[in-house]
Structures are given as C-alpha cells and as structure tokens.
Curated annotation (Swiss-Prot):
<dbReference type="Pfam" id="PF00994">
    <property type="entry name" value="MoCF_biosynth"/>
</dbReference>
<comment type="similarity">
    <text>Belongs to the CinA family.</text>
</comment>
<dbReference type="InterPro" id="IPR008135">
    <property type="entry name" value="Competence-induced_CinA"/>
</dbReference>
<dbReference type="InterPro" id="IPR041424">
    <property type="entry name" value="CinA_KH"/>
</dbReference>
<dbReference type="InterPro" id="IPR036425">
    <property type="entry name" value="MoaB/Mog-like_dom_sf"/>
</dbReference>
<dbReference type="InterPro" id="IPR008136">
    <property type="entry name" value="CinA_C"/>
</dbReference>
<dbReference type="InterPro" id="IPR036653">
    <property type="entry name" value="CinA-like_C"/>
</dbReference>
<dbReference type="Pfam" id="PF02464">
    <property type="entry name" value="CinA"/>
</dbReference>
<dbReference type="Pfam" id="PF18146">
    <property type="entry name" value="CinA_KH"/>
</dbReference>
<protein>
    <recommendedName>
        <fullName>Putative competence-damage inducible protein</fullName>
    </recommendedName>
</protein>
<dbReference type="InterPro" id="IPR001453">
    <property type="entry name" value="MoaB/Mog_dom"/>
</dbReference>
<dbReference type="InterPro" id="IPR050101">
    <property type="entry name" value="CinA"/>
</dbReference>
Amino acid sequence: MKAELIAVGTEILTGQIVNTNAQFLSEKMAELGIDVYFQTAVGDNEERLLSVITTASQRSDLVILCGGLGPTKDDLTKQTLAKYLRKDLVYDEQACQKLDDFFAKRKPSSRTPNNERQAQVIEGSIPLPNKTGLAVGGFITVDGISYVVLPGPPSELKSMVNEELVPLLSKQYSTLYSKVLRFFGVGESQLVTVLSDFIENQTDPTIAPYAKTGEVTLRLSTKTENQALADKKLGQLEAQLLSRKTLEGQPLADVFYGYGEDNSLARETFELLVKYDKTITAAESLTAGLFQSTLASFPGASQVFNGGFVAYSMEEKAKMLGLPLEELKSHGVVSAYTAEGMAEQARLLTGADIGVSLTGVAGPDMLEEQPAGTVFIGLATQTKVESIKVLISGQSRLDVRYIATLHAFNMVRKTLLKLENLL
C-alpha cells in the first residue's frame, strides 16, 4: 500500500513551524507496513490544495491530510476534501457535544459561529474523536482511495493517531508486527557492518537501522498471522543479532539497552531507580542542568530525585559543593578529580544514594588545553567513587551537551544493573 502525507498550512511553508507531524506519521505508517512514498506541504489555499489532493489520489492508496481543521476561514481542509469528493459536510454528534461541554464553562460570547466548523465531518466518513482538542478528524474511502483528515497541533494529532487511526488501519490492512531494539555505545556504520549478512540477505523478518543523535535503533519487522507468531520470529532474530560482537570484540548485548520507539536511556534509568527505591542527585557544569531537567520530566520523578546543583564556574563549584578551590585550580575543572569530587559532594550534601556529575568542554573552543567534546562524568555511591572520560568529537555545542547526558544516564543505568545482578 502506498501512502501520501499532505501538510496543510502556510506557516509550514514560511518556516514559522517545523513539520514534526510528518516524521511521526511516517514512523507510524512503517509500523503498520504502509509505505509512505510522498510528503507534500501546501498553504491555506483551496485551489492549490485541490491540486495536491488530485495528484495524491492518482498515485497513492492512502492520503493523509494534517492541519486546517480549526474554526477560521483559512482552515479549509475538510471543506476542500469534501468538494473534491463531491460530498457534503455534516455535524458529528459526539464532536458537537464536546463543543457544548467546552463552551458551557465559558462566557456565552466566546462561542462564535465559526467554532461549529470544528464539529463537521465529511458525509459517510468515520469520525476520529479528538481527545485533547475540539476539531474532529475523519476517515473515508471513495473509489478505492482512503482519505484521513487530522488536526495540525502535534499533541492533538498524536493522540488521535495512536488511539483512533492506528487501530482503524490495523483492521483495514494486514498488520506488520515490529520490535525496536535500542543501542548506545556503537555507531550506525559499525552496527551495519557487523550485521551486514543479516541485512543484505533479509527477507522476513526485515531489519532497518536508524541513526539518532548519540544512539542507534534497529527495527525488526514481520508480517504474520498473529502477535504470538510475530514474537517468536522476532525473538529468534533478536537473539541472533545480540550474539554478534562489535569490531572491538564487545558483545552487542552489552551496548543494547532496551526496546521501543519512544524509549530512552533516561527512561530506562528512571525506571531502575524506582524499581530499586534509590535516590539520585547531580552536579552539572557543561550540561547546565540538562541531566536534572530530563530526569524531572518523568511523572513521579520526586520519588527518586529531590534536587541537585548547577555549578558552571570554578568558584561556584567550590562555593556550592565545598570543593577546595586550590585543588580545583591545580587539577582543572575538566578532570577526573573535579568530576569525582562533584559527584561525591553532591551525594553527601543531599543524602542521595547516587551522585552523578558532568564537567567538560562543550566547545567550540578548547578549555584547559582540552579539545571541544572532552567530558568527564563522575559517579558516587556509598561504596565507591569513579569517573569516565568521553570524547564527543565532531558535534555541535548542543549535541555535545546532549550526548554527554546520555553517557551519564548510561553510567547510572549500568551501576543499577550491577545491583540487579547481586539480588
């Protein structure tokens, strides 16, 4: 099946917003075994949108339109598609009730007539309820071509796709079962090299590598009758892949950290902290709180994290963490001594079970004769204090800080897994 994505909105063409919906939808379609062959962006113009829909209908089996479902005159996606299909717009009862409930809590004057447009669907379509907004989506098949209309705001679109569209498409078309393996500590080129025979000779299941900032994923996919058979086939392939070794002789199982498209090193670490009822603190220099803000983004973070430190300058490291200023000057802020001292002092000052620290050179200039991308990460527990040195070369300042944070989470994760093995 060939699918096409159409993003509707002049703000996309003018660069005011980034079309993140296209990436999300492409990934979701891939999970369902639906190939996205084309992506188009078009402004809020009926004539041009009609032209784009016409072209898409001639070359694609599934046409997904995003955006333009709001209350204003330039929100014309449903109206234009209805015109193309020669269908009327009708009101969806559930969407109308949601409008009633929403405006019942507001001043009567706030419900202007144009808001009613958000409750309209194309006649004969299956409504797609909007759990986080007011504009209802829809699914309709005409002359063998299926059309989907979705809201533009990502929070609304993602909810509608996950809860409404994916289950609907799964029933309509044969399902592709997938498993995503996540790796940290090996590059895409090396991973593809050590798995080249699997990738070059793949039939079913298939293997698709994807490089992300600082990590790599492998999507294993199979088309089969049910989940149980898929789990068996994908599990066998996974075991074969993880038995391979990197070019340095390290088992791939050692750089594999988890499953899932939406998973992360931070999430894996957070869940282990919760599992073992451990608390953590951090003292950050070059990452300036990125580790702590990432950890705090998870619901329930207060179970494991009470606070930490951001000490950017040498003087603040001495003042906030109680590290000897003369020793800091002697060893330098970009050093194992400073990283270990920051981690241990943070742990002692907060009473946490684990202290982690990040100090280094974000770039682009050198610091203390150390090149950009040099990072020291410290980790302290009740029984030991240690540090690692990481060189993150060829990256922007932003990516150096982000990848350093990944290394810190991975270091904590490995420490917690050692605890798991002792139980």
